[in-house]
């Protein structure tokens, strides 16, 4: 199943934000799937066209602090958005932001982000019923308990899992994070939670690992809190990426299969990605396909329900990564119908 709701907008330009996240990532992928000679005529078998889930303040409070959630629902919201999306630099100047070009108030961005969280929750529910689901949007893995970071205001991954746990739909889960950047927020939020196991394969250097690991008081930088399984990939190690990932996945086997796996299928490791901070990892389209097929079969062969979210992907070519995997996965799933 694929969740594609036309009301979910990915782009940021309406808010005057110049980060290269585009509506076209989901739209171009969907249009090509709709026109596919095999998948197009069977669209009613794989498309969910409406996000019907709702996410409440209570859902956020299972993951984020009362103080932080309170700021998101107050007149402090705009300040939190500016900080999370890094719209003002150290000198107090606008950075990747021109409010004069905005057609929507900045605070409406929070509503859009909550809609993404709802999509992630719905994707997880459908994965439990249908074994596989892919949702456009989601994967906000940098948000931590008390603050947002790296364009992520709330951590939809952990919000979704804790919501399903509260409803007794799942007990255990894996988070397999394929984004170019380390899933630091998810690692921090789940480090004392044995019910959620995290794996992150990411750039060994660069944001969010570009600071000091410890502050002057000897406290660990939250971005350096380890996932249960971390797979750092160094500059020039692209040829080792798939083998490193396979070795990391095999470590999960000894833990025992979870009730659900969430996969952050980031397209930002792509060599054509346009966000400067992804430049330490440049995978080809073929390498990304090998990545995605490896993870898919690893989970499917163990009978683990799998919910996919898009996570990072920047610029005009991000959709290419999504399309090649979704086309392949849908054709695989339609074999059973």
Model-derived segments and spans:
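HDAC/HDAC-like amidohydrolase catalytic core signature
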Residues: 1-337
